[in-house]
Amino acid sequence: MLVHPEAMSVGALADKIRKIENWPQKGILFHDITPVLQSAEYFRLLVDLLVYRYMDQKIDIVAGLDARGFIIGAALAYQLNVGFVPIRKKGKLPFETVSQSYALEYGEAAVEIHTDAVKLGSRVLLVDDLIATGGTMLAGLELIRKLGGEIVEAAAILEFTDLQGGKNIRASGAPLFTLLQNEGCMKG
């Protein structure tokens, strides 16, 4: 049973996100979504907010980024009655893959998708938990495009606006929706 949109409070969801100072390193204010996931009420609120946004957009498939995007994306795909595609860290998928690298603060990483995961012309919603610099989301968007998918939207719970990730995603031509915006994850 879906929660009616008028009963939904994004502010309540924001209050449930735990902030942890100096993790994973000094100077970072980590935003932990696990309290949202641990609560049946708030997890349902999160998924229902996204379901109401996308239920009439003719989504063919939901793709989720490793790892928290899997949790949100799979639940959303189930409610939308569409399939789910994981976009994993390099070396974690067993079948033929296509890969996309992205920059990290120090170095580079890559994500992969199975070559048969997205059919040509499929309408794809890409989901993750948060947007910081946007590198992972941009790499996921590029993988979907490489396979011929049409990006309906990129979606996340939280965007750190001062890190410019949302701006970078929009500049790539992908629409972006986030439930919450925050000025950043840097302490100080």
Curated annotation (Swiss-Prot):
This is Adenine phosphoribosyltransferase. One of its GO terms (biological process) is AMP salvage. It is found in: Cytoplasm. Pathway: Purine metabolism; AMP biosynthesis via salvage pathway; AMP from adenine: step 1/1. It comes from the Bacteria. Catalyzes a salvage reaction resulting in the formation of AMP, that is energically less costly than de novo synthesis. Transmembrane segments: none annotated. Pfam families: Pribosyltran. Homodimer. GO terms for molecular function: adenine binding; adenine phosphoribosyltransferase activity; AMP binding. PANTHER family: ADENINE PHOSPHORIBOSYLTRANSFERASE (PTHR32315:SF3). One of its GO terms (cellular component) is cytoplasm. It catalyses: AMP + diphosphate = 5-phospho-alpha-D-ribose 1-diphosphate + adenine. Its EC number is 2.4.2.7. It is an enzyme of class 2 (transferase). SUPFAM superfamilies: PRTase-like (SSF53271). Belongs to the purine/pyrimidine phosphoribosyltransferase family. Keywords: Cytoplasm, Glycosyltransferase, Purine salvage, Transferase. The keyword DNA-binding does not apply.
